Every structure is written in C-alpha cells, then in structure tokens.
Amino acid sequence: MERNQRKTLYGRVVSDKMDKTITVVVETKRNHPVYGKRINYSKKYKAHDENNVAKEGDIVRIMETRPLSATKRFRLVEVVEEAVII
C-alpha cells in the first residue's frame, strides 16, 4: 500500500506519559440513521512518536502504519498546532 493511500487522521493528544507513544483522541460527527441528528463520536488511538515531540493538548496528524506493538497501529506525521500553556 502506498503511503498516500493510508488512513490519515487529525486529533488531540490526551496523554504523552509513555516513552515514544502518545494517545490521540479523534472526534467525528455522524448523522443518526433514523432521526438525522448529528452525534459526536470519539475514539482513542495510540501512535508512535519517535522523538517525543508531541505534548498533551497538541493537535496532531497521525498516519496508519504496520503494527508497531500490541496496540500501536499509527505513527505521528506532524504537530499541526501546539497547545497553549496557561
């Protein structure tokens, strides 16, 4: 599979406590099949962060890759927006 055909997702980092691993929550909206109301869905993915660049609260782009561990199937591509520290 070519790199440009792999799944690419945007999400927010909710945990960076593991070494070289981040937890990213991806939020999507779907219509209810019967009532048509927009419903928010969220799913957490573990992603490989080789250089420990991403911090908690950052908006990141992750890409599908080969299995890197028992739970990791994505890798960090870029940090789109850094978190604002208050």
Swiss-Prot record:
Superkingdom of origin: Bacteria
Swiss-Prot/TrEMBL keywords: Ribonucleoprotein, Ribosomal protein, RNA-binding, rRNA-binding
InterPro entries tied to this protein: NA-bd_OB-fold, Ribosomal_uS17, Ribosomal_uS17_bact/chlr, Ribosomal_uS17_CS
Any one GO CC term of the record: cytosolic small ribosomal subunit
This protein's record includes keyword rRNA-binding: yes
GO biological process: translation
Molecular function (Gene Ontology), one example: structural constituent of ribosome
Alphabetical list of Gene3D superfamilies matching this protein: Nucleic acid-binding proteins (2.40.50.140)
NCBIfam families per UniProt: PRK05610.1, uS17_bact
Subunit structure, interactors included: Part of the 30S ribosomal subunit.
Record PANTHER family: 40S RIBOSOMAL PROTEIN S11 FAMILY MEMBER, SMALL RIBOSOMAL SUBUNIT PROTEIN US17M
Record HAMAP family: Ribosomal_uS17_B
Family: Belongs to the universal ribosomal protein uS17 family.
Protein task: One of the primary rRNA binding proteins, it binds specifically to the 5'-end of 16S ribosomal RNA.
Protein name listed in UniProt: Small ribosomal subunit protein uS17
Taxonomic source organism: Streptococcus pyogenes serotype M5 (strain Manfredo)
Gene designation per UniProt: rpsQ
